[in-house]
């Protein structure tokens, strides 16, 4: 068996096509969605990631609002940039690119953001709304995983899902999304400290690997026909970026998301969705 590909690039392109029409409809009502970014310092990876987000914006007609600060920026200067975007009506959603320089209180920065403009869906208030099953911007990567599964008809309802990872961006919110009544999955959350991880994985219909541990998920751990989504990012001894899923898993799984090209494009697409939905809420 060779797994079918869960193609994040193609799915993201379809989402962008839909968003282009929604943005055009908003502009007819006098509203242009705007994505703001706050980038502190000159980390090449962060610069590349932010530039990609603004290229995505241009493709669908979303305005770009960029705030760049030097690596020497103080807590107060970064907080001032956050307040500026909170008050800017042209900005319907924004992100603070992480990580921030050492000595900066990241949680304080994130808490200052207007929850309604939280394009990443990771504001403490919005994560709380997710726990309470209240409407809120959803975390981009977990929502991207769900959207990808749905597009390819992978059965979520009643599925046994193992989420490997406990980070705030994926591991923590992913089970919250999967256990909503609209999804009705049964979730086991594992991590790098889980005893006998393999025994949990072998029962899973769906595996979401987000531990950041190279090739943690091995072919012998996977039930034949399972859907496996590789969200992890780490580096090999040679410095090459690798995922959490061993390449051999593709010969056992029924569905697999490539890394790169799987969940990554979906994360960026869901960011745009959050920005457009915020603009749509503003016009009722």
UniProtKB/Swiss-Prot annotation:
GO terms for molecular function: methenyltetrahydrofolate cyclohydrolase activity; methylenetetrahydrofolate dehydrogenase (NADP+) activity. It comes from the Bacteria. Its EC number is 1.5.1.5, 3.5.4.9. Keywords: Amino-acid biosynthesis, Histidine biosynthesis, Hydrolase, Methionine biosynthesis, Multifunctional enzyme, NADP, One-carbon metabolism, Oxidoreductase, Purine biosynthesis. Catalyzes the oxidation of 5,10-methylenetetrahydrofolate to 5,10-methenyltetrahydrofolate and then the hydrolysis of 5,10-methenyltetrahydrofolate to 10-formyltetrahydrofolate. Homodimer. This is Bifunctional protein FolD 2.
């Amino acid at each position: 068996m060779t797994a079918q590909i869960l193609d994040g690039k193609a799915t993201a392109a379809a989402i962008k096509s839909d968003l282009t029409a929604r943005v055009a409809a908003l502009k007819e009502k006098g509203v242009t969605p705007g994505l703001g970014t706050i980038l502190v310092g000159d980390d090449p990876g962060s610069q590349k990631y932010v530039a990609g987000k603004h290229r995505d914006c241009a493709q669908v007609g979303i305005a770009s609002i960029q705030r760049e600060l030097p690596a020497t920026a103080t807590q107060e200067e970064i907080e001032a940039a956050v307040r500026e975007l909170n008050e800017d009506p042209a900005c319907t959603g924004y992100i603070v690119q992480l990580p921030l320089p050492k000595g900066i209180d990241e949680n304080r920065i994130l808490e200052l953001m207007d929850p309604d403009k939280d394009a990443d869906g990771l504001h403490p208030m919005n994560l709380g709304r997710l726990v309470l099953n209240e409407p809120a911007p959803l975390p981009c990567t977990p929502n991207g995983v769900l959207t990808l599964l749905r597009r390819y008809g992978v059965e979520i309802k009643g599925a046994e899902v193992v989420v490997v990872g406990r980070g705030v961006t994926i591991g923590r919110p992913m089970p919250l999304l999967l256990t909503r009544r609209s999804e009705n999955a049964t979730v086991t959350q594992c991590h790098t400290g889980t005893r006998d991880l393999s025994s949990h994985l072998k029962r899973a219909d769906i595996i979401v690997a987000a531990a950041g541990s190279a090739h943690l998920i091995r072919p012998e751990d996977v039930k034949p026909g399972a859907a496996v989504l590789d969200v992890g990012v780490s580096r090999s001894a040679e410095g090459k970026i690798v995922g959490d899923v061993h390449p051999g898993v593709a010969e056992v799984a029924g569905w697999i998301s490539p890394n790169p090209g799987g969940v990554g494009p979906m994360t960026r697409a869901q960011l745009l969705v959050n920005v457009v939905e915020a603009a749509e809420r503003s016009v009722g």
